[in-house]
Amino acid sequence: MATTLRDILDKLLGRQPASAKTARERLQLVLAHDRSDLSPELLDQMRREIFEVVAKYVEIDIEGGDVSLETEDRMTALVANLPIKRSQAKAVSNQAKAVSNQEKAVSSQEKVSNSQESVSTPEAME
């Protein structure tokens, strides 16, 4: 969408957009939903799942995030705007190290347990 000089002046002067322009934007939104054949419930479910997946990797601002359908040049797109607070790469890395250390500890305990079982007792030799 190209911004015209009139749009810029209207924004600077605090003028409300023309009702025809507002109606057109609303119609485009309705058409985008119709073309995608997605119900509002399905779109909301997709939004929640997208947030959950992204939150596994980065800390996001859920309140500031938005998932919407946009149409431009007869093409409908699902657009996710998810403000990132910070990367969780360090947290994920630390968690992976902790799991690895736990696995090593369990493995060591199993080796000790197995070696103790294989040691023969004096009664078994008689």
From Swiss-Prot:
Disulfide bonds: none annotated. Pfam families: MinE (PF03776). Transmembrane segments: none annotated. Keywords: Cell cycle, Cell division. Signal peptide: none annotated. Residues 92-126 are annotated as: Disordered. GO terms for biological process: cell division; regulation of division septum assembly. NCBIfam families: minE, PRK00296.1. Prevents the cell division inhibition by proteins MinC and MinD at internal division sites while permitting inhibition at polar sites. This ensures cell division at the proper site by restricting the formation of a division septum at the midpoint of the long axis of the cell. Belongs to the MinE family. This is Cell division topological specificity factor. It comes from Prochlorococcus marinus (strain MIT 9303).
